[in-house]
């Protein structure tokens, strides 16, 4: 034991002065050099980042590049043929695809109208002293987000059924009106989708805004009160400007979620075949062409158009919000 301690101490002294101990074999020297290299300040950060880079490249970069190349091909079970821009030319005259774009744009617009101001209002109420049992209300509003889309979509399909046994038609009949064919008419079908979206995501967006409100310094509100500001003025000139980063984030993810919506529509109409395509979205059309009709090249072209639309909308939104402007000195 004393001998091993002495050898270890002696080895440490040798390495401290950059000398090689004469009694260490080459294999041990190689291990020490590798260990020293990996634990150096220049290399260690990259070692920890490598797993993320590999996973990002495998699961994001490779599929994206593959989809770009596949969008210029006609892919069948028997052969793959390069067709250049043929898939994109077909998209321009595809009326079903244009209907899907219209449905996705309408859904995205109304989700922005409903799922930004109302969750912000709920967050302000939860942050004030006007509401009691705040924990209960937060749980009630957030619990729908924990429900599976498959289950919630099935429940809403039963609620909005065209028969008189549906909950929504019972409510309509109680008001003295005739039952609606909710999921067979364009505007009522979109209304059902929006009710499902608001039910699921109001609590999530409320928590985003609530976290933004918690980061605002309360001394700003106290200073506003001293200056004679009322509740609306404090909200207008203190809360809204300081909630801008949170609002931009919620707006960005809402745009993406609106364009990428698929499963809610799929479950609400029990498949991807809504009457006259009133519930067909861009991702739903991508699924129909790629999976149901086995036309992967055309489906990839649909996906590339969706990517471009999402990028353009987000860039325009960020430019309008002044995100890219440099701060003036």
PLM regions and their residue ranges:
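Extreme N-terminal basic, low-complexity initiation segments
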Residues: 2-9
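Short, Lys/Arg-rich, polar N-terminal cytosolic tail immediately upstream
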Residues: 21-39
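A structural signal for multi-pass alpha-helical bundles of membrane permease subunits
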Residues: 35-37, 41-329
């Amino acid at each position: 034991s004393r001998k091993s301690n002495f050898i270890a101490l002696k080895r440490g002294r040798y390495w401290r002065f950059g000398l090689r101990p004469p009694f260490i074999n080459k294999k041990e020297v190689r291990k020490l050099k590798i260990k020293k290299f990996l634990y150096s300040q220049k290399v260690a950060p990259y070692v920890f980042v490598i797993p993320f880079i590999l996973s990002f490249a495998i699961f994001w970069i490779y599929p994206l590049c593959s989809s770009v190349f596949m969008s210029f091909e006609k892919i069948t079970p028997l052969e793959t043929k390069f067709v250049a821009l043929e898939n994109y030319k077909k998209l321009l005259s595809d009326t079903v695809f244009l209907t899907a774009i219209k449905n996705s744009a309408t859904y995205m617009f109304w989700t922005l109208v409903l799922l930004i101001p109302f969750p912000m209002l709920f967050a302000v109420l939860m942050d004030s002293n006007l509401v009691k049992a705040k924990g209960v209300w937060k749980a009630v509003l957030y619990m729908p987000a924990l429900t599976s889309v498959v289950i919630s979509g099935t429940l809403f399909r039963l609620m909005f059924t065209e028969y008189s046994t549906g909950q929504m038609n019972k409510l309509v009949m109680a008001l003295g009106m005739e039952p609606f064919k909710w999921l067979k008419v364009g505007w009522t079908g979109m209304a059902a989708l929006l009710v499902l979206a608001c039910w699921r995501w109001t609590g999530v967006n409320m928590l985003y805004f609530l976290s933004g409100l918690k980061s605002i310094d309360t001394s700003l509100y106290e200073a506003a009160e001293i200056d004679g500001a009322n509740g609306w003025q404090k909200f207008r000139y203190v809360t809204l400007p300081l909630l801008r980063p949170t609002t931009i984030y919620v707006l960005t993810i809402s745009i993406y979620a609106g364009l990428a919506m698929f499963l809610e529509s799929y479950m609400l109409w029990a498949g991807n075949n809504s009457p006259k395509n009133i519930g067909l979205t861009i991702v739903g059309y991508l699924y129909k062409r790629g999976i149901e009709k086995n036309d992967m090249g055309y489906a990839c072209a649909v996906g590339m158009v969706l990517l471009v639309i999402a990028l353009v909308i987000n860039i325009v939104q960020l430019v309008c919000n002044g995100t890219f402007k440099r701060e003036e000195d």
